[in-house]
Amino acid sequence: MPKNLTPILEAIEPVIIGHDCELVDLEYVKEKSQDYLRIYVDKQPNGIDIETIAELSELVGEKLDSMQPDPLPDPYILELSSPGLERPIKKEQDWEKAKGQYIHVGLYQKLEGEKVFEGHLLDLDDQEIKLEIKIKTRRKQLTIPRKQIASARFAIEF
C-alpha cells in the first residue's frame, strides 16, 4: 500500500477541477484480498451526476495508467464516487462550509467522558471548534481543540 498518495493527488486533481468538480477525498485501502483506490468527487451547487462520475472515472483511470513510475504497481480497483450527504470534513474550505451545519466529530481522546459528538458547528478558528450539542433536552456549547479531532463529517440530524 502506498504511504504517500500526494503524486496521485497532484496528477488527478487538475483532471477533476477541469470538469468543474472538487476532489473531496482520496484513499487507498485493502479489503479482504483486494486493493482499492477510492476517489470521492463532488460538484457544486447541486452535487455530481452519474454521467460526470463515469466520464471522470475514465479520464482519471487513463491519467493513472500513464504515470511513470507507476505509483500503484500492484493490481487495484479504481472507485470514483460522490461522498454522499455525510461527506468528510478535511480541508479548511470544508470546515468553512460546515459552519452552522450539523456535523459528527470523532476524537482521539475522550472529552467530558465522550469520544464522539454530534451538533451544530457554531464557530471555528485555527485552534478549536465550537459545537452546540444536545444532551437530552438541554443544549450545551462545547469547545473542542482541533488537534484532538480524529475525524469529522457532515451528519443528518434526526
Swiss-Prot record:
One of its GO terms (biological process) is ribosomal small subunit assembly. One of its GO terms (cellular component) is cytosol. It is found in: Cytoplasm. Its main location: cytoplasm. InterPro entries: Ribosome_maturation_RimP, RimP_C, RimP_C_sf, RimP_N, RimP_N_sf. SUPFAM superfamilies: YhbC-like, C-terminal domain, YhbC-like, N-terminal domain. The keyword Magnesium does not apply. Keywords: Cytoplasm, Ribosome biogenesis. It holds the Pfam family RimP_N. Required for maturation of 30S ribosomal subunits. Belongs to the RimP family. This is Ribosome maturation factor RimP.
